[in-house]
UniProtKB/Swiss-Prot annotation:
Keywords: Cell cycle, Chromatin regulator, Coiled coil, Metal-binding, Nucleus, Tumor suppressor, Zinc, Zinc-finger. Residues 115-160 are annotated as: Disordered. Homodimer. Component of the HBO1 complex. Belongs to the ING family. GO terms for cellular component: nucleus. This is Inhibitor of growth protein 4. The record marks 198, 209, 213, 221 as: Histone H3K4me3 binding. One of its GO terms (molecular function) is methylated histone binding. Zn(2+) 1 binds at residues 199, 201, 223, 226. One of its GO terms (biological process) is positive regulation of apoptotic process. The gene is ING4. The keyword Iron-sulfur does not apply. The keyword Cell cycle applies. A zinc finger (PHD-type) spans 196-245.
Amino acid sequence: MAAGMYLEHYLDSIENLPFELQRNFQLMRDLDQRTEDLKSEIDKLATEYISNARTLSSEEKLGLLKQIQEAYGKCKEFGDDKVQLAMQTYEMVDKHIRRLDTDLARFEADLKEKQIESSDYDSSSSKGKKKGRAQKEKKAARARSKGKNSDEEAPKTAQKKLKLVRTSTEYGMPSVTFGNVHPSDVLDMPVDPNEPTYCLCHQVSYGEMIGCDNPDCSIEWFHFACVGLTTKPRGKWFCPRCSQERKKK
């Protein structure tokens, strides 16, 4: 329930409270006034009794004493009624205070529940944003690893369509250069799990790479650093595995 609803319901419940309090206070004032009137009457009766004690007969004395006793009895009744009204007024106010405390407790519980829901939503939203940023970083890393020049293309071993770089004179093409990227830099980059790997190190394409001139080479592309090259060799070049196979033949 919204705070406005709690406040509205509480204000509705105490709408008649001022009138009820005013009525009880007015009744207590009336009782006070009636008690004061009786006290004045008692004083007069007592004065009459004392002043005329010697001249009054026994019956007259008993009559005055009876009137004084009845007046005191009335005062006691008025006092009891006043106490009852005071207790009723206290309970009336206390009831509204307890209801206010209950409504406040419910309102605080609702606030905590909404804060928890808001925290869960912010957490899931933050995770979604982090996931989106991670995906963007992966795409950016792949774009960086493929080089700055649009005409430079990474090798694709799946269909062997991009055997663009061979060191042999038969193809006469220079090796593809992907920029000055070191293996440690690539290892720190986010990697797409679907991106193919190459070389003896089974890493993605980066830096300068060279293709094996054996058309049946299972790996096909190698990083310069992994095969001990610093520059492109002249003539045909075979990877270490293919070189060993050729020596066996």
